[in-house]
Amino acid sequence: MSDNYVLVDPLSSKPIDCWKKYVKQGRVCEPIKPMRLDTPIFENKVRFVCISDTHEKLHEILPYIPDGDVLIHSGDFTNCGDIGEVIKFNAEIGSLPHKHKIVIAGNHELGFEDGEEMSERQLAGLNMLGINKAYELLSNCTYLCDKSYEAYGLKIYGAPWHSMPGYSFFRQRGQKILHKWNQIPAKIDVLMTHTPPLGHGDFNAWDKMDGILCGCAELLNTVEQRVKPKYHVFGHVHQKHGVTTNGETTFINAALCDHKLRSAYDPIIFDIPLPPGKTKQ
């Protein structure tokens, strides 16, 4: 882990105020146009295809998912972690041709969190939903939970944590969720999380707790101050599908469903040059 430790922001529990402070400090969030989905695939570049928040609608989206070398799904592929939903998703993602298919859980993958403390889910009335260790049914993809994966010499890390109470993988804003982000290693190429970082793809008009911004300040600071990946891919917020940049990292909200869980958006693609000495063979 890098020596550049990230500290909890005193305003992390107030995302709107926190982001206003960051803007005054000169933090950058610039929208950029996604690559065209019909862009040719090159032998000297790794093509990533990004999707998230398919919410039991992957079968509707399959015909529109372009080919590529690495497919990544940033969580919420089910609605409640039901065993039938997981089996269905596994079959559907298995039908795609991508050589590497990498998946993380989202808050809707109930039961996927090992050793989950259930009090929040009980309060939300969700404690009877989901199946423990249902991720073991994902035989057609690589499931990451606070783990790394390497494809074509490129390092990818996946983490499912978020700050929405009542669901699996919930951690409070501040030190508790920062503890999880501290596990992300430096020198990775692609970071996958379910929740967005503060200020990038996190506009949520339906969030009743945090107003219109629900991204994580500790995640943003981890990305910008310590990890500095080339790409950060996430979902969770359905209203802000798209691509932004801070000038160093490209941020991708790859959520494909709208707030009514209707398939509404296209996958997003990007390329990373093959590292020296690496091939796709």
UniProtKB/Swiss-Prot annotation:
Transmembrane segments: none annotated. GO terms for molecular function: hydrolase activity. It holds the Pfam family Metallophos. It comes from the Eukaryota. InterPro entries: Calcineurin-like_Pesterase, Calcineurin-like_PHP_ApaH, Metallo-depent_PP-like, UPF0046_metallophosphoest. Belongs to the UPF0046 family. This is UPF0046 protein C25E10.12.
